[in-house]
Amino acid sequence: MKTSDYKALSVEEKVLEVVRNFFREEKEGNHHARDHAKLSLQDYLVKTDDGSYTLNSDILDGKSETMHTRHGAVREAMEKFVKPAKLDGKDNVRVLDICSGLGYNTSTCIDYLSDDVEIELDLVEISKETLTLALLMYSSLESYRFIQKAVEDELYEMGDIKFRYYQDDIPDNIHINLYIEDARVVVKGLEGYKKYDAIFLDPFSPLKSPELYTNEFFMHLKNLLKDDGVILTYTSAAPVRAAIVKSGLHLGEGPSFGRSGGTVASLKEDVIDKPLSMDDERMIALSDAGIPFKDPEFNDSYQKILQRRDQERMLSRGRIRFSSTVKTPIYLNKELDDGRLKRRVLNNLKKLGFDDLKSP
């Protein structure tokens, strides 16, 4: 897969430079390189409400966002990913953590499960520098040291660091595999090879990283699920949910925490605790907001994916789909008392050939 024109959004460039300096100093034999990097990183850490830390993304289209909600990075991992994954009671668990970042989702998962559970954790992170940040971060999570050990071992084998400081072995029941690669390449390679109880999908927001929320990406994720497995993501964006529907998966509301409620998807409908509301279903099915991201060659840049969707929305709006601006689909077959809103909704309806809100 060619990705020469593809640059994934990552943490801010100044943080990446801290990591690169750390690599250089340690390769030169400086035993204090890691301490220097930890000190330099302090200037960029963002403390969240639960006491855990996150970082800002690089600037894209004039804006930046944090890697985690400011309401609590670790609590978000627990409430939006680990708990709704329904891993309780399983003796063997396999989890795919896409855009694993600092490793919070994975370490929270380890802490949550019993010590006698056999756990296989596949972490996917395109940015080696972002993955390295786990070595420079402090976390109160008991199992975070296992993530740090796995990252340290991987970087040592790759020749990026010269010293190993984590001496304790990872417990025999915990198996951590790192994939430092474009997630699109990884999921294609895993098909026919592995099936997962849970897939944590945790990229930056859909408009920043649409390549990991496309029709095609969810089709590949679908093929990686066990029969009762779930895909979990923090976003409730309409194009993301539309792509899930297009892939043939059942979906529902994920738990709310900080940001709006997330999304849960599964092969089986009875795995979904809370179906989407009728309003959400209508907006996805009938408005231009429900046009999903598409990546037919499975190697496009985020710019091309966004442009493709924008063009499709423009062509469909007022022709085969309602404009999403006044949320016309949610008012179908209802009475509207607000005169101004009613005029706007009726104008939208007439563009598609309907006379009023109760037209057949």
Functional labels for PLM-detected ranges:
Residues 2-14, 87-194, 200, 215, ...:
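The AdoMet/dcAdoMet-binding core of the Class I SAM-like
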Residues 198-200, 227-235:
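Conserved beta-strand signature within the Rossmann-like core of class I S-adenosyl-L-methionine
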Residues 211-227:
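A short glycine-rich, Lys/Arg-flanked "PGG" loop and its adjoining helix->strand segment in the class I
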Residues 2-13, 17, 24-27, 31, ...:
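SAM/dcSAM-binding transferase cores
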Residues 197-211:
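A short SAM/SAH-binding and catalytic strip from SAM-dependent methyltransferases
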Residues 2-92, 102-115, 132-135:
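Class I SAM-dependent methyltransferase Rossmann-like catalytic core
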Residues 241-264:
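Conserved Class I S-adenosyl-L-methionine
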